[in-house]
């Protein structure tokens, strides 16, 4: 039995965590199927340890290459320990970030070569790709305004120019792979965004024999 892998992406402050929670709630109406909510970097004991190193504001000297390799290491453990086993059990996996975060942040944001990042992350994930990536797109000024200035981690403390590059990178990635991406205008009300996401996810699940007959897929959110 094969599960479904759905990833939420976007710059910090775009609302990924909120929309993931909305989708999780909608999916709970589907009886007889398990939904796993997770995040990366993190999701495993090793991954959470790496996450602390990556986001620690005391590590300001970290190079872009070190950052990219740490993310890939955490992703390798996350994929092997969490995602692949859950998909093999037929679960729906919802993840706050995955591979495209590295392409956007370390590739477009830090200026590292995309093909090198793809090579490293192919090793880390074994080529695993999400069935759907939901991109919460929000202007940088609006995203920064949503962040708590007293609780920003190392990456959230980057400048506006950095996040503009990351945002442009995400949009380029999405335009290059429209079949796997849903771009959501995160300036809209949260409920409107959630409805658009649920409509796309519902259509995705209806096309899967395992999920097509589940209660809750024929109606709205």
Curated annotation (Swiss-Prot):
Binding residue positions for ATP: 10-17
CC terms in the record's Gene Ontology section: cytosol
EC number: 2.7.4.9
GO molecular function: ATP binding; dTMP kinase activity
Any GO BP annotation: dTDP biosynthetic process
Pfam families: Thymidylate_kin
EC category name: transferase
Presence of keyword Translocase: no
SUPFAM superfamilies: P-loop containing nucleoside triphosphate hydrolases (SSF52540)
Catalytic activity: dTMP + ATP = dTDP + ADP
InterPro entries, sorted: P-loop_NTPase, Thymidylate_kin-like_dom, Thymidylate_kin_CS, Thymidylate_kinase
Keywords linked to the UniProt accession: ATP-binding, Kinase, Nucleotide biosynthesis, Nucleotide-binding, Transferase
CDD domains reported for this sequence: TMPK (cd01672)
Function: Phosphorylation of dTMP to form dTDP in both de novo and salvage pathways of dTTP synthesis.
UniProt-listed PANTHER family: THYMIDYLATE KINASE, UMP-CMP KINASE 2, MITOCHONDRIAL
Family to which the UniProt record says this protein belongs: Belongs to the thymidylate kinase family.
Protein name (record): Thymidylate kinase
Species of provenance: Desulforudis audaxviator (strain MP104C)
Organismal lineage: Bacteria, Bacillati, Bacillota, Clostridia, Thermoanaerobacterales
